[in-house]
Amino acid sequence: MAKNLILVSHGTFCEELKNSTEMIMGPQTNIYPVPLLPSEGAEDFKEKFLSVVENLDDYIVFADLLGGTPCNVVSRLLMEGYHFELYAGMNMPMVIGFLNGVLLGSEVDIIHYGKEKYSSCE
């Protein structure tokens, strides 16, 4: 399993997701948020993403929205030959599941955490 997690999103959602996760799990040095800000375009975002991952050997990427600019830019990198896993629809259970997998040294079913952790609170 990858040891580093890159969070990509529209706006600062990825930064706040990291902050919220740290409230539960404590400080995390292996999570790197890469926000697409309103003043930036796809090329700006690509450069920012590449500058974050250039020194990382092993990482996985969670994106906020399938079909959104952050996810599309990162998926194009996969088509260009970069090697990493990409999951869209990120949420806190996915991030916590990833961190638990790293801590325990075990594989985590990211899809399970992404879709099976919903419940009705009625």
Tell where the protein language model's regions lie, with residue ranges:
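N-terminal loops that bind phosphate or other acidic moieties
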Residues: A2-F62, L66-E122
